């Protein structure tokens, strides 16, 4: 079911039917989009997000997550949010990923906690070490701890959620040519390579940093089950190039 303003969706010409619970949704999909009505306080003009509606948008995300945590829903599919009006309203999270992590922080979970953003396209799974940060901030945030946590979460998820018995991870380098032996940056020598070695000692099958410009072509993708990427566009450019909607 969609959690949203039923009147707004209906005005867009979308055939909808209001439902009171997620359990009612499956029987309705054949004829209309099932909607759990979650009204917005201010009229919406397409293409002009209003900060006055931002708290209701955040509340809708929180409601969806609560339904998943309680078991009423099997999962949550998020739609894009306009971040600038969200921030203007006082929303303090960089994006969905971090907000959902906060909402689920107290939920029972035995594995390594993220959050980790994984995006998939065809045979590619790309996972981010840094997420919604400016590019000039990303290198400072590419730490051994963040890389290791991301790799552990992905390793566990591939086994649990994708039934891959022995996951293979490819680490994308931060710098061009994987740093060229230190000539184009020291992060590979000082952070990425030692972290990969420690992870392998733990039983995580992860490569040393590989140049990102040759990591995502078809033949390369056959050599790993997920790529551990250092920053946002390093992961999202190949994903959206392969399968853009």
Segments from the language model and where they lie:
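Alpha-helix boundary/capping residues
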Residues: 15-16, 107, 133
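Glycine/threonine-rich beta-strand-loop-alpha-helix active-site module
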Residues: 87-116
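Contiguous, glycine/small-aliphatic-enriched amphipathic segments in soluble metabolic enzymes
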Residues: 1-98, 141, 145, 149-230, ...
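A generic secondary-structure signal marking the coil-to-beta-strand transition
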Residues: 31-34, 114, 125
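A generic local secondary-structure boundary/capping motif
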Residues: 24, 105-107, 115-119, 159-161
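Ligand-binding beta-strand-loop-alpha-helix segment within the catalytic cores
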Residues: 117-141, 145-149
């Amino acid at each position: 079911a969609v959690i949203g303003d039923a009147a707004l969706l209906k005005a867009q010409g979308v055939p909808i039917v209001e439902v009171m619970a997620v359990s009612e949704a499956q029987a309705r999909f054949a004829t209309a989009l099932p909607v759990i009505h979650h009204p917005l306080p201010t009229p919406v003009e397409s293409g002009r997000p209003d900060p006055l509606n931002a708290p209701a948008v955040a509340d809708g995300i929180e409601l969806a997550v609560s339904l998943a945590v309680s078991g009423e829903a099997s999962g949550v599919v998020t739609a894009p949010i306009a971040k600038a009006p969200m921030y203007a309203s006082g929303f303090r999270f960089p994006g969905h990923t971090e907000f959902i992590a906060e909402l689920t922080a107290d939920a029972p979970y035995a594995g390594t906690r993220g959050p980790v953003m994984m995006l998939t396209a065809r045979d590619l799974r790309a996972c981010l070490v840094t997420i919604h940060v400016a590019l000039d901030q990303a290198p400072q945030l590419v730490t051994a701890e963040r890389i290791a946590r991301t790799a552990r979460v992905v390793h566990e998820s591939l086994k649990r959620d994708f039934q891959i018995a022995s996951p293979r991870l490819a680490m994308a380098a931060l710098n061009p040519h994987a740093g060229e032996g230190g000539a184009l940056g020291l992060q590979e020598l000082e952070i990425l390579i030692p972290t990969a070695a420690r992870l392998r000692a733990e039983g995580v099958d992860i490569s040393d940093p590989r140049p990102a410009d040759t990591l995502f072509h078809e033949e390369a993708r056959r050599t790993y089950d997920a790529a551990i990427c250092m920053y946002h566009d390093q992961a999202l450019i190949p994903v959206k190039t392969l399968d853009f909607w």
